[in-house]
Amino acid sequence: MKQVAIFAKVHDPRCQGVASELVTWLEERKCLPLVDTHLARHVGYARGLTEKQIRDRAELVVVLGGDGTLISVARLFSSRQVPIVGVNLGSLGFLTEITVEQLYPVLEQCLADSHRITERMMLDVTVTRGDQEISHCQVLNDAVINKGALARIIELEARVNDDFLTNFKADGLIISTPTGSTGYSLSAGGPIVQPLMKCVLITPICPHTLTNRPIVLSYQSVIRITVKSSFDEMVYLTLDGQVGVELQEGDCIEVSRAETTTALVTSPEKDYFAILRAKLKWGER
């Protein structure tokens, strides 16, 4: 019996409806649905579980929603390489590329072990303050260091493999995976990178020096960013746009390739460039 986890945007009626249908569909095929307690309550499923129980037992994951929902699930499963089926019920869909109409044919392939998977690189992000580790997390998209609401720049020292890169004076800095290249990094002027490439991007946000440009580094790079000066202003580290860490002057953020990857089940009817054309409206006037 295959154990299939279901995650969804809990308060979205459409996601609730698809989740309820999916529970029935899985049970008819002798699969065990794994549903967290919040979603279970909304879809009338009696056997709700904790996220930890689901993470430890799932053999396949279905995410109903948008890219944000999938990214949070990817972090939850960062310690396990479980195939994730991302179903687009949100607005973006760079990651959740499978439509509702494709969901059940794709799941049939998954149950028959004939599905296609792409492995997406993740980043390991650690924050140290003096000798103390204050935060550790894996991210699928990016780690962003930025300032608070006041309009002053911050100074960040960047080192790559212990070699000095530069001091960035900017509104902030984005360190992203190839998957994250179409997120915040793209909005800040970073390049689009094919998601299966192995590399890390550093993209400054509104740098004070115009020659501070985005840079693409080897996936083997270890990047260390030190908060040099914040002008008495709050500085934050945001992980995948969902988890926040308050930083102080002198804090060090170390970023390197994570040992695990996110395994995404791909749509049989789409390719990466088709998704780019659709989402970025290339060729339209």
Curated annotation (Swiss-Prot):
Residue numbers binding NAD(+): 67-68, 141-142, 152, 169, 171, 182-187, 242
Catalytic residue list: 67 (proton acceptor)
GO biological process, one term: NAD metabolic process
CC cofactor: a divalent metal cation
Location in the cell: Cytoplasm
Enzymatic reactions: NAD(+) + ATP = ADP + NADP(+) + H(+)
GO cellular component: cytoplasm
Gene Ontology molecular function, alphabetical: ATP binding; metal ion binding; NAD binding; NAD+ kinase activity
EC category name: transferase
Pfam families assigned to the protein according to its UniProt record, in alphabetical order: NAD_kinase (PF01513), NAD_kinase_C (PF20143)
Protein keywords: ATP-binding, Cytoplasm, Kinase, NAD, NADP, Nucleotide-binding, Transferase
Family from the record: Belongs to the NAD kinase family.
PANTHER family on file: NAD KINASE
Protein name per the record: NAD kinase
Organism of origin: Trichlorobacter lovleyi (strain ATCC BAA-1151 / DSM 17278 / SZ)
Name of the gene this protein is made from: nadK
